[in-house]
């Protein structure tokens, strides 16, 4: 046969390329125009190369095995067919070699069906594995760590945000309290605000050593009274006497007792009223000695019938304690007899007391009558002219201001107080932080004593002042983020213990309870005492036992926690992100966008301002935005996620009465006896304890339930089960793809060069 002879000629040729050239021709002959391509018939029949693979002769097989063969010499389509067939023989994937080496069509068809069935099962199981991976499921690992837990930051606030004696000097606050008094009077059905008191005077026409000067009698509801000094025309000495007073002596004594108890804020009717009687008796005994003329400079004068008239001179010009809501002017003394001084305490009615042995802290400016009746007065503005004020008729406030206060239609006292607290926050927002701090309690006034781990605290250094819109000045213990405080043991003796003093006599009329507000939080978190705080009443030891739980959450795609500490529009600068802060920031941004001003209860960004408390339009806009966020679709406008790292403190509260009767010690800086100090601190003081119940804490850590490693393991198992494919088998398919892509690119490049050469030849022939 000719093909056998051609193969044997290879043995007689020293150059293999020459033999290939003789058998197959020049491999580059197809690039020449005159050279004819080898046809398929010539390739398989004339040259006989294709018959070699079907020959079973040993000689032929041996020559084929030992002979060198270059598949690049084959045409492109035959080269691809040869390459794929070679891959079927060599691949490590199960089933594919059986298809390629099948001896007949039926055998090959069976293996094709089996292979396709396995591929379908692989697809279904692989889809299940991928779905499980894409669900991004997570698990929570709970660990109980027996280690020293870091002590949290403790923020302490007085339940009374501002001192009544100082806050009432702010005009907007005074107007707010006046509107509050009017609303409370209407809600309680009080009809006595415009009723004049019955004034009865004694008629000592000839003063005698045993005759007492005119004493004020009357009835009055002082639940909303607020005093301020004012000028008025008065009658002093015999000018103000009346025969009717002697007839009503017994009846009016009872009314005087009731009235004075209300004014002086007396709680203990048996003990403190006796002291008040002693004060009255002493005051009027002095008059018995001094009343030797028709008019004494130090005696009390009457102004109920003359307060509408302008004084005519020095003899009838008095300063009276005036209440705008009731038009009461009492007591009245001549102008030169009042003394400008400082008082120890002032209550919500602006009534002040001097020489209070149990009082401690800031002294308030006041003006005192000879009878020791004192009224808060800072001297910045002159006293009101009562006759001018009353000639204008019943005082009418600006309707827009009353509308902004929001008291219209309210009949529930609790709701009115709540609205008044909000109005106070709005009014205080007009002041700077320094002014608000000045009107509120100082850290030395609130915290008398302090200890941590059994050692005394440095109150000035260990407490940081923070101004809260709802509670005024608050003080944070353990505020230094670079210092890590820990309790050396569990129990109250090794935690934080504080003796606090609230000075209930200087409370605002909107403050409903006496005590302090305590917030337990991380150093990096804003305290939010109005939301997360705990109230500790006066007269008790309030023990707060702590348990710490640390959370570590996974960010996207496993969760939606906030990983970076804060969001871009977070309004609480220098503090870490929290869910409550996020909602408040979202609400504030909404208010700023739609109302052009911010809610005074929350901070505002730079270049923004708070809404005016007296602006009814702004207040309505704020209320509308609050209703929007509290409605059905409010949660869709503010989406706030949990932080990725969070410390949660579980608190257990237990109280006990304090101080005990056996605690006969000088508490704080009280100057009275031990019994007096105990009684005073029971009404104005409290002991607060914050400690860990156990020196261990829980760690809750989220981790991925099905990670990428699990995906590879399960997916590889499915490939091996159904197709016998491993990672190396996958690499075989990758290389097959790369090789075929390279052959296609090489073939296309050869065609491109050929066309380019033909084009150049045509151009060259055309030039001749």
Curated annotation (Swiss-Prot):
Q: Known consequence of changing residue 713 to G/S/C?
A: No degeneration
Coiled-coil regions listed: none
- The entry annotates sugar attachment on 335, 356, 480, 484, 503, 671
Point out the gene that encodes the protein: mec-4
Q: What is this protein called?
A: Degenerin mec-4
Could you list which ranges are Extracellular topological domains?
Answer: 131-718
Record's subunit section: Component of a non-voltage-gated amiloride-sensitive cation channel complex (also called the degenerin channel complex) composed of at least the mec-2, mec-4, mec-6 and mec-10 subunits; the complex mediates mechanotransduction in touch cells. Interacts with mec-2, mec-6 and mec-10.
Give the matching Gene3D superfamilies: Acid-sensing ion channels like domains (2.60.470.10), YojJ-like (1.10.287.770)
Query: Transmembrane helix: is it a keyword of this entry?
Result: yes
Q: Which residues lie on this side of the membrane: Cytoplasmic?
A: 1-109, 740-768
Annotated GO biological process = detection of mechanical stimulus involved in sensory perception of touch; mechanosensory behavior; negative regulation of turning behavior involved in mating; positive regulation of detection of mechanical stimulus involved in sensory perception of touch; positive regulation of mechanosensory behavior; potassium ion transport; response to mechanical stimulus; sodium ion transmembrane transport
Additional comment? Mutations in mec-4 results in the degeneration of a small set of neurons which typically swell to several times their normal diameter before they disappear, presumably due to lysis.
Give one Pfam family, short name only: Mec-4_10_cyt
Protein function? Subunit of an amiloride-sensitive cation channel (degenerin channel complex) permeable for sodium, potassium, lithium and N-methylglucamine, and required for mechanosensory transduction (touch sensitivity). Negatively regulates the turning step of male mating behavior.
State the compartments where it is located. Answer: Membrane; Cell projection, Axon
Q: In which tissues is it expressed?
A: Expressed in AVM, ALM, PVM and PLM touch neurons.
Report residue spans for region: Disordered: 184-219
Membrane topology, as annotated, equals: Multi-pass membrane protein
Looking up NCBIfam families in the UniProt record yields:
deg-1
Organism whose genome encodes this protein? Caenorhabditis elegans
Q: Name one GO molecular function term.
A: ligand-gated sodium channel activity
Substituting residue 230 to E results in:
In e1339; abnormal repetitive turning behavior during male mating
Keywords noted in UniProt: Cell projection, Glycoprotein, Ion channel, Ion transport, Membrane, Neurodegeneration, Potassium, Potassium transport, Sodium, Sodium channel, Sodium transport, Transmembrane, Transmembrane helix, Transport
Q: Where is the composition biased (Basic and acidic residues)?
A: 189-200
Classification via InterPro entries: Deg-1 (IPR004726), ENaC (IPR001873), ENaC_CS (IPR020903), Mec-4/10_cyt (IPR054001)
Where would you find the membrane-spanning parts of this chain?
110-130, 719-739
Q: Which family does it belong to?
A: Belongs to the amiloride-sensitive sodium channel (TC 1.A.6) family.
CC annotations in GO: axon; membrane; neuron projection membrane; plasma membrane
């Amino acid at each position: 046969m000719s093909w056998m002879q051609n193969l044997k000629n290879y043995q007689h040729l020293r150059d293999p390329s020459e033999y290939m050239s003789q058998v197959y021709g020049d491999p580059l002959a197809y690039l020449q125009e005159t050279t004819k391509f080898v046809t398929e018939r010539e390739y398989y029949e004339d040259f006989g190369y294709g018959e070699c693979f079907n020959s079973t002769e040993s000689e032929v097989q041996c020559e084929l095995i030992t002979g060198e063969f270059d598949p690049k010499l084959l045409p492109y389509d035959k080269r691809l067919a040869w390459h794929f067939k070679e891959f079927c023989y060599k691949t490590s994937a199960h089933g594919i070699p059986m298809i390629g080496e099948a001896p007949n069509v039926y055998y090959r068809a069976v293996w094709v069906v089996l292979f396709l069935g396995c591929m379908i099962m692989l697809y279904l199981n692989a889809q299940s594995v991928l779905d499980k991976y894409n669900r991004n499921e997570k698990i929570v690992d709970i660990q109980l760590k027996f280690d020293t837990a870091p002590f949290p930051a403790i923020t302490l606030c007085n339940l009374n945000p501002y001192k009544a004696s100082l806050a009432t000097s702010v005009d907007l606050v005074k107007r707010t309290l006046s509107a509050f008094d009017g609303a409370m009077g209407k809600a309680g059905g009080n009809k006595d605000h415009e009723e004049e008191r019955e004034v009865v005077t004694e008629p000592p026409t000839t003063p005698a050593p045993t005759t007492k000067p005119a004493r004020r009698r009357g009835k009055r509801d002082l639940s909303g009274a607020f005093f301020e000094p004012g000028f008025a025309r008065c009658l002093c000495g015999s000018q103000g006497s009346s025969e009717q007073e002697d007839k009503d002596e017994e009846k009016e004594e009872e009314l005087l007792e009731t009235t004075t108890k209300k004014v002086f804020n007396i709680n203990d009717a048996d003990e403190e009223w006796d002291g008040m009687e002693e004060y009255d008796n002493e005051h009027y005994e002095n008059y018995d000695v001094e009343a030797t003329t028709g008019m004494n400079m130090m005696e009390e004068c009457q102004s109920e019938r003359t307060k509408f008239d302008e004084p005519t001179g020095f003899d009838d010009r008095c300063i009276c304690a005036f209440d705008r809501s009731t038009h009461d002017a009492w007591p009245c003394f001549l102008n030169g007899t009042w003394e400008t001084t400082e008082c120890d305490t002032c209550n919500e009615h602006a009534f002040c007391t001097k020489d209070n042995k149990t009082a401690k802290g800031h002294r308030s400016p006041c003006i005192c009558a000879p009878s020791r009746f004192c009224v808060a007065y800072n001297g910045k503005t002159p006293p009101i002219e009562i006759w001018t004020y009353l000639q204008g008729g019943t005082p009418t406030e600006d309707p827009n201001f009353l509308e902004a206060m929001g008291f219209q239609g309210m009949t529930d006292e609790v709701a009115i107080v709540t609205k008044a607290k909000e109005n106070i926050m709005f009014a205080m927002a007009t002041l700077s932080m320094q002014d608000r701090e000045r009107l509120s309690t100082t850290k030395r006034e609130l915290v008398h004593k302090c200890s941590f781990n059994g050692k005394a605290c440095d109150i000035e250094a260990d407490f940081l002042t923070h101004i809260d819109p709802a509670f005024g000045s608050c003080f944070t213990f353990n505020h230094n983020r670079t210092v890590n405080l820990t309790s050396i043991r569990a129990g109250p003796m090794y935690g934080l213990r504080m003796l606090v003093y609230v000075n209930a006599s200087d409370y605002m009329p909107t403050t409903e309870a006496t005590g302090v507000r305590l917030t337990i939080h991380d150093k990096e978190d804003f305290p939010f005492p109005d939301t997360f705080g705990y109230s500790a009443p006066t007269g008790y030891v309030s023990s707060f036992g702590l348990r710490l739980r640390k959370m570590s959450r996974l960010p996207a795609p496993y969760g939606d926690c906030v990983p970076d500490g804060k969001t871009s529009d977070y309004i609480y600068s220098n503090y870490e992100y929290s869910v409550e802060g996020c909602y408040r920031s979202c609400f504030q941004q909404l208010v700023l966008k739609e109302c052009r001003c911010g809610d005074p209860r929350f901070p505002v960004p730079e270049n923004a301002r708070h809404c005016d408390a007296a602006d009814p339009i702004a207040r309505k806009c704020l209320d509308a935005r609050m209703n929007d966020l509290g409605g059905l679709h409010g949660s869709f406008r503010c989406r706030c996620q949990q932080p990725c790292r969070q410390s949660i403190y579980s608190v257990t509260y237990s109280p006990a009465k304090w101080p005990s009767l056996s605690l006969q010690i000088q508490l704080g800086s009280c100057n009275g006896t031990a019994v007096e100090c105990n009684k005073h601190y029971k009404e104005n003081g409290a002991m607060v304890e914050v400690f860990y119940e156990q020196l261990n804490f829980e760690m809750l850590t989220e981790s991925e339930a099905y990670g990428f490693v699990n995906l590879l393991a399960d997916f590889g198992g499915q490939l091996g089960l159904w197709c016998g494919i491993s990672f190396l088998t996958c690499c075989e398919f990758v290389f097959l793809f790369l090789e075929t892509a390279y052959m296609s690119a090489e073939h296309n490049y050869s065609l491109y060069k050929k066309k380019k050469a033909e084009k150049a030849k045509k151009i060259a022939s055309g030039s001749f």
